[in-house]
Regions:
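Amphipathic alpha-helical segments
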Residues: 1-23
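Intrinsically disordered, low-complexity regulatory regions enriched in serine/threonine/proline
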Residues: 2-7, 29-217
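Long, charged, glycine-rich C-terminal linkers/tails
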Residues: 23-29
Length: 217
């Protein structure tokens, strides 16, 4: 029986999660909240070879972000030691953009510093021991944002695994700068269209919630 390549495995994972492949870009997309398709999409870009990379950009609630990380973890069993969370800026090598924002009273605030420190203090030692990613994502909410499950966040996240380079890969990544550019600003405007989160996911899928969000744009 022929063994699937890494690219084929990632393709199958994306499809099983309900993503549709965009013919023009080659990215996988999934609408999360009906009616807000311009604001909420995931972008998966699988690569073949030794590096397993899955990237996405999303405007979403923090709780939903963690749920998605857990969902990805379940679908990528066998790659769990290769799923790393980065938060920083564009580096010469590798070329990766990652940033995360949330808002308080409509004022964007970067979380890169907190997330990076969280990785250094907590996550990094566990990766050496092939720690489960699900525990990491749970801890981000429980330890850092216990009362912020309904916080809107704008995120660009990048998962990458390279067996050859291993944990030494952290050294350069953690030197990333926390700079915002024009593309960041344009994206930040989009997640403000999220309807109110009150713990009931079905409520924000309703017509009333969607219409209310459009009026606030």
């Amino acid at each position: 029986m022929k063994k699937n390549s890494i690219k084929e495995s990632i393709d199958a994972m994306c499809k099983s999660l309900g993503f549709k492949k965009d013919r023009r870009s080659g990215h996988y997309m999934r609408e999360v909240t009906p009616g807000l398709e311009d604001a909420i999409h995931f972008f998966f870009k699988p690569y073949s070879g030794k590096a397993v990379s899955v990237s996405f950009v999303v405007g979403i609630y923090l709780k939903e972000l963690v749920d998605l990380i857990d969902e990805l973890y379940e679908k990528t069993d066998g790659y769990k030691s290769l799923l790393w969370l980065w938060c920083g800026d564009l580096l010469p090598d590798p070329k990766v953009v990652q940033w995360m924002y949330y808002t308080e009273n409509g004022d964007p605030e970067q979380l890169c510093g907190e997330i990076r420190q969280f990785i250094v203090d907590y996550a990094e030692p566990f990766f050496v021991r092939n720690h489960d990613w699900k525990d990491i994502s749970d801890s981000i909410v429980k330890r850092k944002y216990a009362d912020a499950e309904g916080t809107p966040v704008a995120v660009a996240m990048y998962y990458r695994g390279e067996q050859d380079r291993g944990i030494d890969y952290w050294t350069e990544i953690l030197k990333g700068r926390d700079n915002r550019n024009e593309k960041d600003e344009l994206f930040l405007k989009k997640y403000r269209s999220l309807p109110p989160y009150d713990g009931d996911i079905q409520r924000r899928y309703s017509v009333e919630a969607i219409e209310g969000a459009r009026k606030r744009k």
